[in-house]
Regions:
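A short, conserved structural fragment
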Residues: 94-107
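Short amphipathic alpha-helical interaction segments
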Residues: 78-96
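Generic low-polarity alpha-helical segments
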Residues: 70, 89, 100, 117-118
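Short amphipathic alpha-helical interface segments
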Residues: 1-81
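Short, cationic-aromatic polyanion-contact patches
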Residues: 104-118
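Generic structural signal for short, flexible, solvent-exposed coil/loop and linker residues
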Residues: 2, 54, 87-88, 101
């Protein structure tokens, strides 16, 4: 996947509220694009593979998880190896309405409740 085709067909699907900023999620041919504001008029973009939300839904349906849970129990290093890939995959879940970020925490870790609906 090259930068020239990264944004082909991208359409906005939703947003997720993080601790410090909002994350904007787009569905594109290359996967889900998560855009996070970095400075005025500047965004960073992370690509999340298309099958990540389905894997999370199937594995963790109806449970509360943290970013670390994805690494320990996700069993998909191709999807969940790096910390920010795991975090952004959870933000994609929130934007798609398949999860919600809880106000409570597990220690310092953010908790996400994965929807029990298919």
């Amino acid at each position: 996947m090259g930068v020239k085709t990264l944004f082909n067909g991208a359409r906005f699907v939703g947003q997720a509220e993080g601790d410090r900023r909002k994350y904007y999620v787009f569905d594109a041919a290359s996967g889900y694009l998560v855009a996070a504001p970095q400075a005025p008029h500047s965004y960073s973009v992370t690509v999340i593979q298309r099958d990540a939300p389905e894997v999370i839904s199937n594995k963790f349906r109806g449970t509360q998880i943290t970013v670390s849970t994805l690494k320990a129990k996700g069993h998909r290093p191709d999807l969940f190896d790096r910390y920010f890939d795991r975090l952004n995959a959870l933000y994609v879940m929130v934007a798609l309405g398949k999860a919600r970020k809880l106000k409570k925490r597990l220690g310092k870790a953010m908790l996400f409740k994965i929807s029990s609906a298919k």
